[in-house]
Amino acid sequence: MQTLFKFFKKYNSLSLEAEKAIAGISKIIHIKKNTDLQAIGHTCKTIYFINSGLARIYYFKDGTDITESFTFENNIVARIESLFTGKPSRKAIQILEDADVVAINATQLFKLYNKYPEIERLFRLIFESAYVDTVNRIEGIQFHTAEERYKTLIKEAPDVIKRVPLKYVASYLGITQVSLSRIRSSK
């Protein structure tokens, strides 16, 4: 749990009492590679912190597997739209490497907001950051070429090529594997 609380400190400090409250609604789980942490059609009720390993969010469009995002160690992953609306998600969270994950019960977490305003502030800041990342991702698709998106990905996550199957990287970039190979060989 210490890694989780270190991550939280990047956003907002918590009192020891607030940390204990979060620890009380969290559990550490081990997930095997290629397992869906949350399946398509599931209503999200858990916020996950990746202690070790790697996850991706994906969905199917016209029968094609599309990768929306990757989440590396020391970061949060959840289906936020499902979490806040209470509706089943059309996307899944898949573990790409054996992973140790902290699962935070979101229903219980939200109940802590009134008692611990610092927890509410913490998660507001985390969700704001996730929103900004989403906007940046959308703008990357709208305004940048595939090669520029690839360079940005390598700059932000240099290990992605070593750790993620190229079909998922290509899908994330919105290109075919052949196009990704061309971009990589032109370097």
PLM ranges: what are they?
Residues M1-K27:
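Cyclic nucleotide-binding regulatory module and flanking cytosolic helices
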Residues K27, L54-Y59, D100-V101:
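Short beta-strand segments in beta-sandwich/barrel cores
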Residues N34, K45-R56, N74:
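Glycine- and acidic-residue-biased ligand/ion/polar-headgroup-sensing regions
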Residues L37-H42:
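Short phosphate-coordinating micro-motif centered on Lys-Gly-acidic
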Residues T67-L125:
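Cyclic-nucleotide recognition modules
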Residues A130-E139:
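Short, Lys/Arg-enriched N-terminal segment that forms or immediately precedes the first helix
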Residues H144-K187:
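Phosphate-/nucleic-acid-contacting segments
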